[in-house]
Regions:
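Active-site SXXK
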Residues: 52, 72, 98-126, 234-242, ...
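N-terminal secretory signal peptides
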Residues: 1-12, 22-25, 30
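Boundary at the C-terminal end of the N-terminal hydrophobic targeting segment
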Residues: 37-41
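Structured C-terminal helix/loop/strand segments within mature extracytoplasmic catalytic/sensor domains
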Residues: 385-433
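Acidic helix-start/capping segments at beta-turn-to-alpha-helix junctions
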Residues: 127-135
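Short, conserved catalytic-motif segment at the N-terminal edge
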Residues: 42-99, 119-121, 135-144, 378-380, ...
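Short, surface-exposed loop or secondary-structure junction motifs
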Residues: 77, 137-380
């Protein structure tokens, strides 16, 4: 039987991306990988190369890949290792990886395309599209009770984009609301076909419409617009996009982002024909890598209940680099404009409600834009996010610097990989760490 494991199973609560004001970037591909319009650049990034080699040679990870771009065109690539333990296929720019929450910025940008076209507004109540959210309630004691009072504020698009809607997340939420989420299939994400000891399995709702309807019947953790709480808001946003656009969410992504940007290796279900370039996912346990989702039998080979806008994508470094390159150029790539310059800049700006900060959270010290973190201070203008299986990506439109780093292990906080990666990149490109 296929087991769809609740995201809490292998995802560290603070392991999605501990950016801490640091940038993250890198790339990995083996010198033996077939040439497909890219070139190995390990000599340009000695720190990244050394660290990647250390992770792989010590058996901590089978393969790592990163891309770093500082101008238009193809990025530099650094790659070490293979697609899985005991395998000989080297990782390369077209290898497929589970990027989990790095799906969120893609969904956020999809919503901003509709804002650009006037089909949605940032501060428009989502109840205009999903009437079931017109009369929400808010828990009075979220960790201990389901007692709730009527919400004073309507959930808006801005709230969904910035995790300030007051929604929960099965990987973070506690108490009786967590059980209600599990009972109702409010678990938009998949990890493994197999049960994981000590973790609760819960199948997602059968479709995104049911997901929205069931979620609307459950209380919020906080009043909308008052607190930053990492949540399922980007998954719900997929349903808002469907109604606002009149298109299936996944079809909208393909038509408005993937196809225009020539992102030909981005999926929510990995085709059988592409298994040969799909990596396996591992859980490090007492120094040993345990395969929780082998590529050959991956749960991602099955059609998901729906396209999870918060954690469902499988993609290549080449594809995600093209997404970032479009953002670096404020909405345009290779002569194809995805959104206006003004809207692209808006999407990567701090969209948090005026009274909300990320203080006291794992995103502390940053703002939040359309599904991704926004740097402040010396990192002002940097936009990006990470994934639960060790991936991370960012773009700085001011300098045109962009980077994607791919790894595949859970929980991501087992190793300091995502945090350290920033230091390696900064050192290799000549910036003080």
């Amino acid at each position: 039987m296929n087991m769809q494991v609740n995201g809490q199973a292998m995802i560290g609560r603070r392991g999605f991306l501990t950016w801490g004001g640091q940038l993250a970037a890198a790339g990995a591909i083996s010198a033996f990988a077939p040439a497909r319009a890219w070139a190995q650049a390990v000599d340009l990034y000695p720190t990244i190369r050394t660290q990647f080699e250390s992770y792989v040679s010590s058996g901590k990870l089978p393969g790592l890949l990163a891309t770093i771009g500082r101008a238009a065109g193809m990025p530099d690539v650094v790659a070490i290792g293979t697609q899985g333990l005991g395998e000989t296929t080297p990782v390369n720019i077209d290898t497929l990886w589970r990027v989990y929450s790095m799906t969120k910025p893609v969904t956020g940008i999809a919503a901003m395309i509709l804002v650009d076209e006037g089909k949605m507004k940032l501060d428009q109540p989502i109840a205009d599209f999903l009437p079931e959210f017109a009369n929400m309630t808010v828990l009075t004691d979220p960790d201990n009770s389901m007692d709730a009072v009527p919400a004073k504020t309507q959930i808006t698009l801005r709230h969904l984009l910035t995790h300030t809607a007051g929604l929960g997340y099965s990987i973070i939420t506690k108490g009786p609301l967590l059980q209600a989420y599990l009972d109702n299939g409010i678990t938009p994400g998949i990890v493994s076909r197999f049960p994981i000891p000590g973790q609760t399995a819960s199948a997602p709702t059968p479709d995104i419409k049911t997901f929205s309807e069931r979620l609307a019947k459950l209380p919020l953790v906080a009043e909308p617009g008052t607190k930053w709480i990492y949540s399922i808001s980007l998954d719900l946003l997929g349903r808002v996009i469907e109604v606002a656009s009149g298109m299936d969410f996944e079809a909208f992504l393909k038509a408005r982002i993937f196809e225009p940007l020539k992102m030909t290796s981005s999926y929510f279900q990995v085709p059988q024909s592409e298994i040969k370039r799909f990596v396996s996912n591992y859980a490090p346990v007492n120094g040993v890598l345990f395969p929780i989702d082998p590529a050959s039998t991956s749960i991602y080979l099955n059609k998901p209940a729906f396209a999870f806008g918060g954690a469902g994508m499988v993609t290549s470094a080449r594809d995600y680099d093209r997404f970032l390159n479009m953002l670096a150029n404020h909405g345009e790539l290779d002569g194809v404009r995805v959104m206006s310059t003004a809207t692209a800049k808006l999407a990567m700006s701090d969209l948090l409600p005026s009274a909300v900060t990320t203080d006291g959270t794992f995103a502390e010290g940053a703002g939040f834009g359309a599904g991704g973190r926004v740097g402040k201070g010396m990192n002002a203008g940097v936009f990006g996010w990470g994934g639960a299986a060790g991936t991370v990506a960012f773009v700085d439109p001011r300098t045109k610097l962009r980077a994607v780093c791919m790894a595949q292990y859970m929980p991501s906080n087992v190793y300091p990989f995502q945090q350290d990666f920033a230091k390696w990149v900064l050192k290799d490109i000549g910036f003080p760490a």
